[in-house]
């Protein structure tokens, strides 16, 4: 039975399997996961195109405070692992010795299942030797405030904007969710290798300058080969992002389909989400050496063999999203 004890903001409960090594780095800003076993990224039956997606069990369960979320990312800049991927290309893999990519994943505070990464590889099978896959879990503080959203057309025409229309474009979320779902506004066909531009006619304002709205993909979309380029919603600009179809066939999106999620963060690390709109990097990596935000309170990654007891109770438990999307 799970404990009902609330976690302190700076404590993350961690259970790690023998197949992975987990250790805190960069002054505790992230938990680095390195494979102790050979990871086989095998193409599943029915996979098509040059790239195929694989759901990789990263061997950990984590539990953080409800005011936080965890971002799963591929790590670069560590001396003991291969070089990080360059910008995505269907032809070359500049700088990517391992020939695999990892999509950003959001682990909600309520998720208690094993964290899984959506990864992409080329060829028939890609084998990653022990010690050559480096992933990271980055703790991200969520904003306690919402943002005020107005229609850009009303603002530009000098008319008084309506009251906050946030929920006209973003679905309500549960307390244990990190993000607000974003639905497609129209039907669309995304051609192979096409980056489809999504723009919502809205701008935001906030009384708290630390609030940083960011847009992330959804694991279910990643598994389909539709990658939302993770980006921040830049102040003064419309809400916009790109969806890349890495398949060798067109993919159809229907109006109302959930395609992305908005996460309201506070002072998110620019090494994780740069300050500008992301136009060309569907699979960014996180470099702890490039981090510019420093947590005033050190993060304690509390390792345990009694996870179900030490982790606070959760309405979601092992179901739903948690970098699985299934």
Swiss-Prot record:
The keyword Cell inner membrane does not apply. One of its GO terms (molecular function) is dUTP diphosphatase activity. Keywords: Hydrolase, Magnesium, Metal-binding, Nucleotide metabolism. Pfam families: dUTPase (PF00692). Substrate binds at residues 218-220, 321-322. Its cofactor is Mg(2+). It catalyses: dUTP + H2O = dUMP + diphosphate + H(+). Its EC number is 3.6.1.23. One of its GO terms (biological process) is dUTP metabolic process. The keyword Mitochondrion does not apply. Transmembrane segments: none annotated. Belongs to the dUTPase family. Involved in nucleotide metabolism: produces dUMP, the immediate precursor of thymidine nucleotides and decreases the intracellular concentration of dUTP to avoid uracil incorporation into viral DNA. This is Deoxyuridine 5'-triphosphate nucleotidohydrolase. It comes from Equine herpesvirus 4 (strain 1942).
